[in-house]
Swiss-Prot record, chains A, B:
Pathway: Cofactor biosynthesis; thiamine diphosphate biosynthesis. GO terms for cellular component: cytosol. It catalyses: 5-amino-1-(5-phospho-beta-D-ribosyl)imidazole + S-adenosyl-L-methionine = 4-amino-2-methyl-5-(phosphooxymethyl)pyrimidine + CO + 5'-deoxyadenosine + formate + L-methionine + 3 H(+). It is an enzyme of class 4 (lyase). Its cofactor is [4Fe-4S] cluster. One of its GO terms (molecular function) is carbon-carbon lyase activity. This is Phosphomethylpyrimidine synthase. Gene3D superfamilies: 6.10.250.620, Radical SAM ThiC family, central domain. The gene is thiC. Homodimer. It comes from Methylibium petroleiphilum (strain ATCC BAA-1232 / LMG 22953 / PM1). It comes from the Bacteria. The lineage of its organism: Bacteria, Pseudomonadati, Pseudomonadota, Betaproteobacteria, Burkholderiales. Zn(2+) binds at residues 426, 490. Binds 1 [4Fe-4S] cluster per subunit. The cluster is coordinated with 3 cysteines and an exchangeable S-adenosyl-L-methionine. Substrate binds at residues 228, 257, 286, 322, 342-344, 383-386, 422, 449.
Amino acid sequence: MNAPDKLATLLSLTREPFPASRKSYLQGSRSDLRVPMREVTLTNGETVSLYDTSGPYTEPGVAIDVRRGLPSVRTPWLDERADTEVYAGRLHQALDDGAKHEDREAERIEQLRLDAAALQRPPRRARAGANVTQMHYARRGIVTPEMEYVALRENGKREWMREYLGDAPREQRLRGNPMGAQIPAIVTPEFVRDEVARGRAIIPANINHPEVEPMAIGRNFLVKINANIGNSAVTSSIEEEVEKLVWAIRWGADNVMDLSTGRNIHTTRDWILRNSPVPIGTVPIYQALEKVGGVAEDLTWAIFRDTLIEQAEQGVDYFTIHAGVRLPFIHLTADRRTGIVSRGGSIMAKWCISHHRESFIYEHFEDICDIMKAYDVSFSLGDGLRPGSAADANDEAQFAELRTLGELTQVAWKHDVQTMIEGPGHVPMHMIQANMDEQLKHCHEAPFYTLGPLTIDIAPGYDHIASAIGAAMIGWFGTAMLCYVTPKEHLGLPDREDVKQGIVAYKIAAHAADVAKGHPGARARDDALSKARFEFRWMDQFNLSLDPDTARDFHDETLPKDASKVAHFCSMCGPKFCSMKITQEVRDYAAQRGVSEAQALGAGMAEKSSQFRQAGGEIYIPLAVDKG
Amino acid sequence: MNAPDKLATLLSLTREPFPASRKSYLQGSRSDLRVPMREVTLTNGETVSLYDTSGPYTEPGVAIDVRRGLPSVRTPWLDERADTEVYAGRLHQALDDGAKHEDREAERIEQLRLDAAALQRPPRRARAGANVTQMHYARRGIVTPEMEYVALRENGKREWMREYLGDAPREQRLRGNPMGAQIPAIVTPEFVRDEVARGRAIIPANINHPEVEPMAIGRNFLVKINANIGNSAVTSSIEEEVEKLVWAIRWGADNVMDLSTGRNIHTTRDWILRNSPVPIGTVPIYQALEKVGGVAEDLTWAIFRDTLIEQAEQGVDYFTIHAGVRLPFIHLTADRRTGIVSRGGSIMAKWCISHHRESFIYEHFEDICDIMKAYDVSFSLGDGLRPGSAADANDEAQFAELRTLGELTQVAWKHDVQTMIEGPGHVPMHMIQANMDEQLKHCHEAPFYTLGPLTIDIAPGYDHIASAIGAAMIGWFGTAMLCYVTPKEHLGLPDREDVKQGIVAYKIAAHAADVAKGHPGARARDDALSKARFEFRWMDQFNLSLDPDTARDFHDETLPKDASKVAHFCSMCGPKFCSMKITQEVRDYAAQRGVSEAQALGAGMAEKSSQFRQAGGEIYIPLAVDKG
């Protein structure tokens, strides 16, 4: 079948709501401020509502046409601020899509296709002298709708959580250890404003991405995850890219980076942005390199600047900028085990060496800030010198760059430009905390955004696991967003299943961090699932899990019958004997007696004894094994 | 095809040596002391030798007949000690294999099959008054062949490791943080003896398991992993059990627990033990429960004792004994979120409640010690009250039991019985270290052996990942052995692929812990693989990884051609541009100049510049995407 049909088929799959789930909304202070949540209805009548990144795609009522894009929820908010202007925008060039000058025919076709693209529209920018960043508003004491949206979203529905956790955890042991984070009991819009004003959180939301459902990245908010997608001349189509996006946010990607290269990247980006409810990040140097035929030393500030404006006009929410790869640092990588492994970093290193000049990105950093604040593009200051192996972790090259990123953070903040800092990479467990400490020390609490880190080098094919270990730890220590790693890392291109595996592994890491930090309510979902498990509500256990489909499929491999979904046993212990059942018997007994359970246990022994004997005829039919 | 044929087919798969690998041996002080290693030959001529748990199965020359079992490497050592006697052994009963008394025909058939079993042989036990535990020898200053074997095995071939690491890591940052462990530069037989004498390590090696290749479990040795296997009346055959064992040790299981239940468990255990080069553990209460028809309250000391002797005679190397589930602790579980989730723990809880009496296992603990020391069966003191959910982690029920296990450890040591302590379970990250600290404090540095722990409850289908995070952390903190969790945990029976997934996840966790602890040489394999990666030696990268098959398959999905196995690029960056290649250019350039790389970088810039320009015609053909 042709590409559109194929896409339609894939989308029909990814648009299916999760089992027993429906979209609900938290109503904000204005009618057009509605924060989506996923409500899971349990078989005992309870409702659990969960943070939802999947956008309108999981709402059956909404008609989706990827050629028209998603509704622009933020447009009224932008209009009301009255500090932006719509303008013609930069003239699109065939080169933006990778067409070569000599390639006349391709250029003509590109142009035709682009002219026809319904998604094209004139961009906005800040009016002369205006600064339209969320940080700028925050510092002027303005609480934007984006900030209120984030506050509602971070809290979720606290009502059901209290049923499990109470207003505060019963015991100290369950309160978590925030490791220096200052997480409030309730996130208020004012708290969000203050965090953004301090630079401790960012809300990536380009004024040319009105489709975005605002979210925050910061140490005092829920830990977020990023998934990378990207086209490939040889392996995928533009339409497949949009489907990859929808697939990624279905499984919980809070942000997506479009790392496309080669042909059609400009158009690919248009389609992704117009159809994305989550912030989109890019690495502009990749496209700039395309424009100079892949010859790093031919890069110029003019070409790079033009690319930043091109992407800012399209609505990219954050740029990875490798401004810390400075000429004086490059020789520090010479005796590394694996040198420079960041593509952006190596591009700039090649440029610096070939010209024996300081990085033009570093030298033009304030010029870049001027572009960022005209569109509210956030900085993701890239770690171009991150370690590519355990042997290179925490070395001078890495930390010299980190200190520079700290200096640049203050420059960006001088312009009220939102900023986060990228981190490694490959780091053994004993060196992970030092990464967080150094980042906090030198980068003034700007959000940290790490790739993994991978705790060992010998797990190709399983690097999503080797890195989930490091990601969970650094997330607990204070990292605000975790960039996922798929099983294909170091080996090849992630396919649809690899993307899902990477995302689920990182949802585990991020949630483990939220629970350890003691984020209010984070553990409520665990309690709800464990309660369902204990009460043999199998469907509820599946439906509350990160991947209900897989949980149910695995269970059904051994016990396919629907009856077993309500049976008070599982395949591990068999029907006649179950450890959880015994505890329930103890508890029921205590309840009958109407006295404290502890007393009942003592007083009731004799009676209990005879009860058990009556059941003595049971024959224990074990079906399988369980640990200890 | 019939079972034997099926087994033969499966075995032929699992007997295939790993790619570019051959079995080699470290020769000990006596001709019959030869420690197996796996030698991987790299394409650059280097040889890397790795710890090998796979036994004779991966040596093509060795003829294997599962009906005859493996060679008894330890028999001469046992004979020389001259402190054991061969005796008739306990009379086998049909009930041992789960045949019911009323089931005459089944009983007859069982008996016939058992009489015919070539694997049956008279057991050994300590001569009257003798104590044959490794701890007993160690405390008398005797270095046994088992101890020397362990020393050679723990060191591995240090020669090749030095090529990467030098005698000591260049920099402090790479030396690891042992978190209180005292890991020597070289493990001597005397060090092993001392660790065993102190009780800080155990060598599980029943005198009736002469086929075992000795290994150590202790905080100052490499972190080990355990895989659980077990039959199931409905899902597998005895022969499949043996194949499961071979499959588990192929992927790196250091120990295997046979958690079989139901029919044929006695015979299954015989076959597993006679064919296992790794220590085998069991939970004897499971079989004892079979013998009383699954009615926990009908258990008696006589039945339990008889089962311990039955299994000790077969050669089981360690018993999980839930002696810490005491009557006074049971009520502490009543208001838990998930009560008692350990099967052994709940069996004993049911017994205590129904009789309103103290646990017969606790009361007869010293009688059990007498059995253990007559066969050198090690204790694995079970945590029957471990938490089954994050909400129950580190509660009083758990820690009350842990303190009791500490008391019992000293009782066991009074009898020179080797002992390790089992740990949880479900524990959020911020509570993991407290588990290790409490265990060290109350259990006198007896080896800790934990199940995970799982850091969150919401990942059914992915609990091998949710628990690998906790396992890696607690392994770093000092846990000696990690019991694996498979993707099927909480949902169903692990199949062949689940077992592999669980083992690889736990090899990652254990290796991450070894690297973080700074175990000498642990990081050498990472360096060798990263060097291969950096030098585009693809086959070496695959062959040094934990799962060469998967690494190669993933790579080949994108670049199947054999040519690309030596190509200086990968699918992530494409043929004309590679970040690692650039670093190599920088390094080569510096080398040519014959001056320090740092100087060369400065001095050589201008020249480098022109060189790069010559290559300017290159067109960058990107094939895919990579993170920033």
